[in-house]
């Protein structure tokens, strides 16, 4: 959601707004690092356009995709953070021409995140969790959402579907058992970065359990938790650069 990056945009100084293709790109600096912040919009197609514009129009050298996701793996809980190792499109199926989930003409199912950028993101999140989640979101939000976040690294699946049933969750896990969480954009952005040879990583805050219990107050969670997580994580990444 657009609100997920409001606080990240607030970090920028020397801001300039550029509008292209019904998208708003906020150009500026976080600390001494030149940055461009944009809302990807929902779904793989929209995110592909946004990522391509970031690379082609703004010449970004690294791309960090941050937002929320639904948990698939057992044990993940609301407020946990997942950083990608690999990304896969769970709704991609061009059989019998190629294998299920395979990216056409790329001869691969998974796209790997950049190891150095992923390590940097992990260090940033670890630093923040060591200081305590209440420093990111405040004590009231910690109580309201029962936050006790854990950091995970692993596979993230993307598709043009909101997963909110046990049947769909179990179907994805049966075919892709290593996937930790599911969302709607990351793997498409990963493909763009792969083809343009731009290092990337994906950081996701778990907002729901992607099953029949997925009906949560997203607006409240986005404003009080995800937005604050994003600001803190991006700010800490920049501090570590």
Where do the model's predicted regions map?
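N-terminal short beta-loop-beta anion/metal-coordinating cradle
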Residues: 1-58
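Short glycine-/acidic-enriched loop or helix-start segments at secondary-structure transitions
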Residues: 7-10, 74-75, 92-93, 212
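A C-terminal functional module that forms or caps the active site or interfaces directly
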Residues: 159-215
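His/Asp/Glu-rich mid-to-C-terminal helical/loop segments that flank catalytic regions of hydrolases
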Residues: 210-241
């Amino acid at each position: 959601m657009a609100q997920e990056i409001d606080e990240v945009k607030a970090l920028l100084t020397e801001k300039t707004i550029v509008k292209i293709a019904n998208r708003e790109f906020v150009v500026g600096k976080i600390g001494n690092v030149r940055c461009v912040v944009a809302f990807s919009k929902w779904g793989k197609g929209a995110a592909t356009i946004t990522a391509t514009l970031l690379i082609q129009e703004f010449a970004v050298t690294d791309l960090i995709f941050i937002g929320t996701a639904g948990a698939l793996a057992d044990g993940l809980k609301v407020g946990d953070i997942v950083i990608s190792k690999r990304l896969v499109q769970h709704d991609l199926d061009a059989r019998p021409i190629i294998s299920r989930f395979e990216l056409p003409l790329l001869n691969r199912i998974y796209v790997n995140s950049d190891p150095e950028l992923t390590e940097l993101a992990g260090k940033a999140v670890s630093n923040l969790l060591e200081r305590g989640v209440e420093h990111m979101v405040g004590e009231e939000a910690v109580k309201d959402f029962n936050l006790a976040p854990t950091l995970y690294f692993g596979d993230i699946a993307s598709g043009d579907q909101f997963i909110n049933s046990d049947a769909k969750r179990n179907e994805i896990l049966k075919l892709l058992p290593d996937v930790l969480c599911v969302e709607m954009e990351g793997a498409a952005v990963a493909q763009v970065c792969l083809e343009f040879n731009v290092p990337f990583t994906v950081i996701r805050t778990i907002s729901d359990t992607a099953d029949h219990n997925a009906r949560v107050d997203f607006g409240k969670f986005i404003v009080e938790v995800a937005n604050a997580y994003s600001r803190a994580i991006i700010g800490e990444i920049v501090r570590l650069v």
